Amino acid sequence: MTYRVIQWATGGVGRASIQGIVSHPDLDLVGCWVHSAEKVGLDVGEICGMDFLGVTATDNVKELLALDADCVMYAPIFANRKEIVRILESGKNVVTPLGYFYPGKRDVSDLETACQRGGVTLHGTGIHPGGITERFPLMVSALSRNITHVRAEEFSDIRTYGAPYVVGEIMLFGKTPEEASKSPMLDVMGGGFLESIDMVADALGFALDDQKRTQHAVAIATRPIDSPIGIIEPGLVAAQRFTWEGTVRGQAVITVRTNWFMGEEGFDPAWSFGPEGERFEVEVQGDPNSKVSFRGWHPESVAAGLKRNPGIVATGIHVVSAIPYVVEAQPGIKTYLDLPLVSGRAAQEFAK
């Protein structure tokens, strides 16, 4: 069976998603929403640096919702909840990396109602959050008994993130520590990571305390550091670490952490990626302990990452891979705990 898909937004994740949709044997790209006026009317292939696809980009929501489509891959910079409700009510499933990984403790009655009205499903997935923080820890946890702690952690050179404005003006790299302390990222990312913690806790049976612990720490440059946002002068923020913890009687049992550095030299404190370098890590402490490092999701160089970042690609493809399973699911908000095991597909030259 072929599932008809609309791509919503064509940023880094969106472009990777389009590549994934086009190469997936069970998916067909039938529409594309774009934010930028200069992209309206262009063939989606041109936007993504691909061959002609025969799908024209538009910013006309009404026109897109009138299409005969099974699913929308929803990936703008920020989620518009009313827009998601509208898509669901139009009878289209939604997969997204922008949250809804495990929203049971939030008021999502409007989304649940929209799912029931449209007879469709909403599913949040991705990499971090959306994979490293819940799907993979849960898989690895099956190898241990008496689990006492689960950790999911990212170590990344933020210079490879191809959105300089976001890095400088939203993440607040290159600012003073006082300015960076006002970063919205702890709350913005926490919306997803706290859901991840709840999912792991519920699946493993941890009796979490009511409040989660959070921490935002920064390291400053000790020398000028060249970066895509310009020179980061000594005394300005060149590395950031965000931590979210689920605790039981005050003891951390689930830890999610993001380490974003402008390289890994010239910091105070002297943070580094360690001998293992850039990676994503999952660790389960129990009997026995397990530790898994995921590599290949970081570019080989800053220049390569600004052209194509494998971590961004992996995020988009993970969302796309879920589409057939989401379309076949019963209406409602569905998580990893509800869906079958999601897998990718063989390259065309090796397929059945």
Question: Can you name each region flagged by the protein language model?
Answer:
Residues 1-90, 205:
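N-terminal glycine-/serine-/threonine-rich beta1-alpha1-beta2 phosphate-ribose binding loop
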Residues 8, 12-16, 59, 106, ...:
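Conserved active-site and cofactor/substrate-binding residues in soluble primary-metabolism enzymes
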Residues 8, 141-270, 278-280, 309:
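Active-site-lining helix/loop region of Rossmann-like oxidoreductase modules
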Residues 93-95:
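A short hydrophobic/small-residue beta-strand
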Residues 97-99, 126:
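Short beta->alpha connector loops at strand-helix junctions that form conserved
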Residues 99-121:
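Rossmann-fold NAD(P)-binding glycine/threonine-rich loop
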Residues 132-142:
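Alpha-helical support elements that line or immediately flank enzyme active sites
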Residues 226-352:
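C-terminal active-site/capping subdomain that shapes the small-molecule cofactor and substrate pocket
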